[in-house]
């Protein structure tokens, strides 16, 4: 991460002051000019600790098992995801299909040991799984980023991998990929699905 050169997210007043200060540097008769901004930017989580308004009860599988827990999480995050999409005017969800639920069901079909066919015949199983996982992770990340607290990327990543049922599904599908004879799935299990800090801690 390159930090926050223009201030914290969702702080337009601070960001404007930073930009005005930057533009004022062009008024110096000679340069280059190295000047400190007179204010300290608030650190993510400094004023408000992260208390996600949606609690997943440590992501323990519920009556519907892991699949039910993932789909329940998606439903609970839905209002936050929609808020994020309206604020930004766009979303990165959609490389697999039109909804996070569709991506989740594809991922979960592998967890259950009965993989669905790829939605696009041009995609290999590995490509479909990767796209579905990317969609699912983007949905969670965008939803939680819309919640109060100004979380940084590391906090969001830790929350996803340590506290959600979706992360448990990713770990399960990684095991499937590692044991698979499909050459498009094996690299996912070895390299692409799970960050090293998660697998090293297993």
Which residues make up each language-model segment?
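Conserved, well-structured core segments that form the ligand-binding/active-site neighborhood
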Residues: 1-55
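Short, structured coil/loop segments at alpha-helix boundaries
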Residues: 8-16, 60-67, 159, 163-164, ...
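Charge-patterned, long linear interaction tracts outside catalytic cores
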Residues: 32-99
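Extended non-globular C-terminal regions
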Residues: 83-202
């Amino acid at each position: 991460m390159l930090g926050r050169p223009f201030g914290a997210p969702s702080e337009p007043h601070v960001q404007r002051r930073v930009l005005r200060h930057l533009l004022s540097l062009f008024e110096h008769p000679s340069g280059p000019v190295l000047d400190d901004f007179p204010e300290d930017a608030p650190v993510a989580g400094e004023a408000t600790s992260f208390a996600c308004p949606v609690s997943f009860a440590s992501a323990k599988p519920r009556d519907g098992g892991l699949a039910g827990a993932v789909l329940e999480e998606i439903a609970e995050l839905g209002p936050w995801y929609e808020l994020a999409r309206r604020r930004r005017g766009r979303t990165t969800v959609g490389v697999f299909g039109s909804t996070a639920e569709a991506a989740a069901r594809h991922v979960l079909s592998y967890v259950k040991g009965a993989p669905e066919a790829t939605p696009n015949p041009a995609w290999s199983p590995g490509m479909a799984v990767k796209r579905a996982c990317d969609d699912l992770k983007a949905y969670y990340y965008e939803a939680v980023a819309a919640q109060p607290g100004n979380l940084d990327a590391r906090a969001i990543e830790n929350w996803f991998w340590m506290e959600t049922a979706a992360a448990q599904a990713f770990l399960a599908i990684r095991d499937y990929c590692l044991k698979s004879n499909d050459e498009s799935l094996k690299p996912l299990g070895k390299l692409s699905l799970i960050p090293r800090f998660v697998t090293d801690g297993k």
